[in-house]
Amino acid sequence: MTTYHDELKQLDHTYLWHPFTQMQEWMGEEPCIISRGDGNYLIDVHGRKYLDGVSSLWCNVHGHRKKELDDAIREQLEKIAHSTLLGLSHVSGIQLAQKLVEIAPKGLKRVFYSDSGATAVEIALKMAVQYWQLKGESKRTQIASLAESYHGDTVGSMSLGYSETFHRFHKSLLFPVLRITPPHVFRYYQRLNETAALDAAIQEAEQKLDENKSTLAALVMEPLMQGAAGMWAQPVGYLHALSDICRRHGILFILDEVATGFGRTGKMFASEHAAITPNILCLAKGITGGYLPLAATLSTEEIYSAFLGEYNEYKTFFHGHTYTGNPLGCAVAIANLDLFKQESLLEKMQPRIAYLARRLREDFLPLAHVSDVRQWGYMIGIELVQDKANRKNYVPEQRIGHKVILEARKQSVLIRPLGDIIILMPPLGIGDGELATLLDVTYDCIRAVAGD
């Protein structure tokens, strides 16, 4: 007898093309088909519950079916589902812009909406380059970014964060970028301690940015944690230093907080750890609590003012998408931000962040095939290698990371790897018992797949 799951599986295999998924492999595995959510759990068509260990790709904040967020969407839906911001405005878009400016690093005054992290970054790039054109510095078109970073999958964001694995087929579309080596001891500075690596990385950044300051429009970076690049952590001093270097050399400083924003690092924005304000800030993922696609690019008044002029001066920022600033997304984003305050969410996270750090250090790091653990708040990367002593990676074809997450699924926990780096990114509202379960299952699955 054909079940509902079997029917959906057949339809999926017939019609659907999944993102970042090798479809031949996908069609050879039994799919997990989600039908609903409840709290920090996803529920499949069989009724089986899974702990959402990666916040539905790093965006869920308070859990699924959060009453206040559900209600906000219903209330907005009774008014209007969508109205454009091109030549018009709308209530929830205005109100959210005010709230974002109020909580953002001091000095960010203007909000430009879009619908994904990649588009938020793309907008920042276009703003930065056009800003310098409008200021009469036409040579300043070059962009700098951190080596092996990841900023999205549009052409501009791919150029910023080039990955040979992801983007090799699109090289001809990409523009050249000045690469700055970040202070990752495990990746780049194996012969140095953390202090020496930080000094070396800052020295390189100073030199490269100084040498290219006359042509550089901006430096773009993810603060404190390079997420999809492999959960590469940075010390606060690095963020502070790059902000200072850009300020001294007159280079716009753009922070991509698509992943790190909205509480992920333990503060509302990662830039708060260094008490700095970028010229442009990119936000997405957690902005709606993980409910609807929405993104925002915030700028200083200085940047915004450069675009003001008579129509025939062509200073307009010619960018905008159909669903930019969708009212439903803005309404649920407002409710999401209200919940941060009402539930003292950031304060409640602090002991859990300490618990995560202790478990990672005491339980995971001693494992024979765990070479490194990297954490900022609720952003965690556990790197698996074949030979820990010699830092020898597994052969990619072994799919060790993939095998770990399949094993976790058998134990009703959903996580997702980046190669052989196991990513944990739980909802910010996760409870103590659920957090312990996430760690226990991940630990057991690493041991089961890779050995002790």
Question: Model-found features: residue ranges?
Answer:
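Conserved N-terminal phosphate-binding loop of PLP-dependent enzymes in the Aspartate aminotransferase
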Residues: T2-D452
